[in-house]
């Protein structure tokens, strides 16, 4: 009960220090605490968008981790990504400064509000943003803590005036099951974070607890187009669950009459809620982002809006006001009339969804899909190697770089080159190529881009920075590139 105790004793001047404050999850919580009146500071190894944003508010940021950074702090917040040998952790333990996990701090914030927790292997960040837009359109100004930058706000977290809090619930280390939410959303469940869970069944069990831990008056929202989620929903009888999908005719909320282009998706929705007679049709809902997966994300938000009686007008207005999320199919530049897209996809299922969207758009433009993928983490590649071999079918031309380690040690035989070799050997793709250096992607674009093409730069590593610097890199070689964002 940290936050409640601080409030009761008026100890808001005590300093809360975040180790790894530049991380998207940590920076969001730090920003909310700062806006609530707490004294916040933090450290990180490098400067980034998040640290610069926090510094602009007056939050002190230390570059690098050192014992002296926590000289005058009362609490230390860490995430699961922080090495236990970190000098600031060692100093906090030595001085008996309370160390709080990021998920526990998030739980404290959520305990004070009526909370919506959004989880799932993919789509959490976009879904969280969409839900927030509907709340605002309904006249409820929520507090939001997201896993990505919401373009409407240019931040991943902001303090609202209502009693609602909407948060992305990270499932990577099972701490999300302890988050005190009233409404829980599950977008999908795929084999991910198996370095922590060890097996898929344990991961599924965590999602089961995520739902069953809801209070009796709460409800879950689940996508039953996903077979694992459907099975889970069928097994749970003690909590109210609202289902959604595109292919599932028995879902409570279904999208149909779907049309999508490079900038948006339009669809109709059929609503048949449990214990409610009759069916409601909402026609011509438009979301300003393409892709079937984003339509599913919007259905989750619609389910929450319908259950909370937001009304059809608020739902449509909320989506009209949505401006997307940074690094989710973000068009960053144009070269030779080809679109260059920056996307966070780093799991095989995310890659398939992103490339399917790109393929649909490219076909309408008589173009091709050029995929440049930077794998993220050796452990993920090892666990999902076979899935990675099969997820690039919608790319007409494929380039794979070496693996972005994200702090992990190399694993023998697990490299970007070995993935390309296996894809080629097993004939899963006839135009798969290895990029020895990310900078070689500039030449790939110069040599291959043509009018109507979709150039998709994917990964959770530094490929995003590269994509956003393409105008300068192309200009330095004498080629003109139009920057979009």
Curated annotation (Swiss-Prot):
A GO MF term: UDP-N-acetylmuramate-L-alanine ligase activity
Gene Ontology process terms (BP): cell division; cell wall organization; peptidoglycan biosynthetic process; regulation of cell shape
Subcellular location: Cytoplasm
Claim: Cell cycle is one of the keywords in the record: yes
Gene3D superfamilies xref list: Mur ligase, C-terminal domain, Mur-like, catalytic domain, NAD(P)-binding Rossmann-like Domain
Pathway: Cell wall biogenesis; peptidoglycan biosynthesis
Chief place of localization: cytoplasm
Annotated binding of ATP, by residue: 120-126
Keyword annotations of the record: ATP-binding, Cell cycle, Cell division, Cell shape, Cell wall biogenesis/degradation, Cytoplasm, Ligase, Nucleotide-binding, Peptidoglycan synthesis
InterPro entries cross-referenced by the UniProt entry: Mur-like_cat_sf, Mur_ligase_C, Mur_ligase_C_dom_sf, Mur_ligase_cen, Mur_ligase_N, MurCDEF_pg_biosynth, UDP-N-AcMur_Ala_ligase_MurC
Catalytic activity: UDP-N-acetyl-alpha-D-muramate + L-alanine + ATP = UDP-N-acetyl-alpha-D-muramoyl-L-alanine + ADP + phosphate + H(+)
GO CC field: cytoplasm
Physiological role: Cell wall formation.
NCBIfam families for this protein: murC (TIGR01082)
Family, similarity comment: Belongs to the MurCDEF family.
Name of the protein described by the UniProt record: UDP-N-acetylmuramate--L-alanine ligase
Source organism of this protein record: Rickettsia rickettsii (strain Sheila Smith)
């Amino acid at each position: 009960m940290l936050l409640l105790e601080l409030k009761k004793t008026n100890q808001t001047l005590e300093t809360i220090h975040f180790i790894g404050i530049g991380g998207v999850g940590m920076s969001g919580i730090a920003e909310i605490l700062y806006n609530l009146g707490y004294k916040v500071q933090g450290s990180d190894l490098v400067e980034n968008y998040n640290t610069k944003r926090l510094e602009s508010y007056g939050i002190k940021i230390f570059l690098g981790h050192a014992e002296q950074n926590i000289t005058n702090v009362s609490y230390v917040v860490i995430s699961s990504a922080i090495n236990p040998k970190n000098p600031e952790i060692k100093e906090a333990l030595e001085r008996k400064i309370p160390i709080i996990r990021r998920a526990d701090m998030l739980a404290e914030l959520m305990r004070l509000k009526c909370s919506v927790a959004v989880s799932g292997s993919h789509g959490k960040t976009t879904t969280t943003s969409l839900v927030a837009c509907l709340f605002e359109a309904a006249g409820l100004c929520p507090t939001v803590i997201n896993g990505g930058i919401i373009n409407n706000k240019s931040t991943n977290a902001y303090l609202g005036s209502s009693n609602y809090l909407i948060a992305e619930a990270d499932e990577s280390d099972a701490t999300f099951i302890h988050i005190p939410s009233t409404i829980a959303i599950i977008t999908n469940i795929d084999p991910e974070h198996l370095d922590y869970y060890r097996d898929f069944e344990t991961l599924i069990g965590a999602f089961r607890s995520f739902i069953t831990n809801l209070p009796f008056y709460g409800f879950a929202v689940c996508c039953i187009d996903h077979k694992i989620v459907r099975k889970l929903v069928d097994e749970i009888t003690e909590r109210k669950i609202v289902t959604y999908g595109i292919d599932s005719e028995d879902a409570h909320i279904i999208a149909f009459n779907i049309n999508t282009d490079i900038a948006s998706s339009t669809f109709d929705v059929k609503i048949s809620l449990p214990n409610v007679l009759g069916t409601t049709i909402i026609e011509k809902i438009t979301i300003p982002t393409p892709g079937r997966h984003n339509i599913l994300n919007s259905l989750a938000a619609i389910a929450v809006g319908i259950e909370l009686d937001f009304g059809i007008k608020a739902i449509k207005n909320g989506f009209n006001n949505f401006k997307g999320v940074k690094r989710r199919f973000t068009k960053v530049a144009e070269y030779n009339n080809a679109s260059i897209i920056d996307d966070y996809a780093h799991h095989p299922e995310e890659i398939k969804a992103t490339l399917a969207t790109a393929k649909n758009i490219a076909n309408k433009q008589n173009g091709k899909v050029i995929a440049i993928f930077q794998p993220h983490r050796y452990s993920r590649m090892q666990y999902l190697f076979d899935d990675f071999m099969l997820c690039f079918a919608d790319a007409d031309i494929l380039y794979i770089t070496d693996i972005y380690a994200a702090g992990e040690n190399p694993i023998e035989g697990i490299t970007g080159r070995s993935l390309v070799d296996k894809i080629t050997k097993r004939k899963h793709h006839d135009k798969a190529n290895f990029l020895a250096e990310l900078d070689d992607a500039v030449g790939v674009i110069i040599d291959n881009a043509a009018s109507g093409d979709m150039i998709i730069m994917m990964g959770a590593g530094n490929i995003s920075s590269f994509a956003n610097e393409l105008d300068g890199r192309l200009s330095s070689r004498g080629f003109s590139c139009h920057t979009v964002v």
